[in-house]
Amino acid sequence: MDLVPSSTLWSIAQELALYLAFTVPTAFVIITTPKSSFLRLAWTPCLLYILYRFSLQVPSLTTSQFLNGVAAGQATVAALQCLNLLLITKLDERELVHAGLCIPSSSLLVRVACAWALLVNFRGIGTVWEVKNVPQHAAYLQKPKQHRLSRRRYVLRESAIIIWQYLLLDLIHMSTKDTPPGDLARLFGPGLEYRYLDATAEQWFGRVSVGIFSWLVPSRVCLNIVSRIYCLVLVVLRISAPESCRPSFGRVRDACTIRGFWGKFWHQSFRWPLTSVGSFVARDVLRLPRPSLLERYTNIFFTFFTSAVLHLACDAILGIPPSGSGAMPFFCVVPLAIMFEDGVQEVWRRVTGPSQGAVPFWQRLVGFLWVGSWMYATSPWYLYPAARQPPERTWMVPVSVVGEIGLRVAQKVLLVYGVVLYWAIGGEI
């Protein structure tokens, strides 16, 4: 692998230009038009066309399915956020001024920049639109009697964690890259994602590795390292303060329910645009009574349905056709799991009375077993197509350190370095 081929640099430059070509004009429209302006609707097909042009370029960025997926996901959710702020939430300059994000006397360029910053702030951190359950900074960064976080401590901690995560992703790829194609076909071949009772022991192990382990380690770290690098650059360049760059993932302890897995443990980067669509359909289109169980679960369903459409689009950009993607069934059954566990919890409360204090350990253990079983059963629908990719498309880091020092040395370095990190800078799992 070349480090940065000139063709890749040119492709990245083109993609950045296209990304700005639909986000910056959207910010301009938000600032300069009233909420009901026809121009907002007229801009929508232009926005979608630019996104389409962006999608055509993604496969030429790298040979890495992961990195191309990050690019496709970032652009797709940015486009959805544009539509959200223009047509659903319908923000305008007055609301941005009222929220303290811009000053009317500022130049047009400054006001557009403020709108653009809000647009790409998918979690709305530090604004009145901040989504729920955004994780707080680690205790290591939050010193007593200090209202602001130390930029130096933030940069040091994030840099150290990024190095560890880089080594981990490198180790995972180098450990699996020599898997024979026959083994991949036997474990993750087409149709095996829906095989349960007649699966072999080896295939059951494959379901565990993809359905449970991949969410806890490779998938989480893949997305987390991108977020950390992005925030680190913003803080180093003093574009953002450390306070605005909160962690992207929650703690594993929050994943003892399906609702907690998606609402607290997993990243909330898409939550604002996704929940806006769900609320819009349930309350404005269907006009369901609020509050009501029907409105609540309809909202949840359309939130996950929109997420399924986004992931389906990303798969298509990466060359996985809709017929070969399991995004739609995987995400659309999540509301059923949430309804089931809500019902069980409600019955339990009525039988035992309101809970007092912390949730008992045995209940949390049952919760983890439930979540693990659900992810084991359904995750292969969505993740197996990616697991079938050949090794030359599964690399996650541009330069392999593990390839130079060897697997055994890398394992020891990763273990020692991880322990030091955990105790020295407040590692959190």
Curated annotation (Swiss-Prot):
Protein name: Acetyltransferase pyr8
Membrane topology summary: Multi-pass membrane protein
Molecular function in Gene Ontology: O-acyltransferase activity
GO cellular component terms listed in the entry, alphabetical order: membrane
Biotechnology and industry use: Pyripyropene A and its derivatives have very unique characteristics of selectively inhibiting the acyl-coenzyme A:cholesterol acyltransferase 2 (ACAT2) isozyme. Therefore, pyripyropenes are expected to be developed as a new type of anti-atherosclerotic agent. Furthermore, pyripyropenes have been shown to exhibit anti-angiogenic activity against human umbilical vein endothelial cells. Finally, pyripyropene A also exhibits insecticidal properties.
Pathway: Secondary metabolite biosynthesis; terpenoid biosynthesis
Presence of the UniProt keyword Transmembrane in the record: yes
Role played: Acetyltransferase; part of the gene cluster that mediates the biosynthesis of pyripyropene A, a specific human acyl-coenzyme A:cholesterol acyltransferase 2 inhibitor. The first step of the pathway is the synthesis of nicotinyl-CoA from nicotinic acid by the nicotinic acid-CoA ligase pyr1. Nicotinyl-CoA is then a substrate of polyketide synthase pyr2 to produce 4-hydroxy-6-(3-pyridinyl)-2H-pyran-2-one (HPPO) which is further prenylated by the polyprenyl transferase pyr6 to yield farnesyl-HPPO.
Encoding gene per record: pyr8
Highest taxon, organism lineage: Eukaryota
TM region(s), chain numbering: 12-32, 39-56, 69-89, 154-174, 221-241, 300-320, 324-344, 365-385, 409-429
Predominant place of localization: membrane
Natural source organism: Aspergillus fumigatus (strain ATCC MYA-4609 / CBS 101355 / FGSC A1100 / Af293) (Neosartorya fumigata)
Alphabetic keyword roster: Acyltransferase, Membrane, Transferase, Transmembrane, Transmembrane helix
Family stated for the protein in its record: Belongs to the wax synthase family.
EC number annotated for this UniProt entry: 2.3.1.-
InterPro entries recorded: Wax_synthase, Wax_synthase_dom
Cell compartment(s), UniProt: Membrane
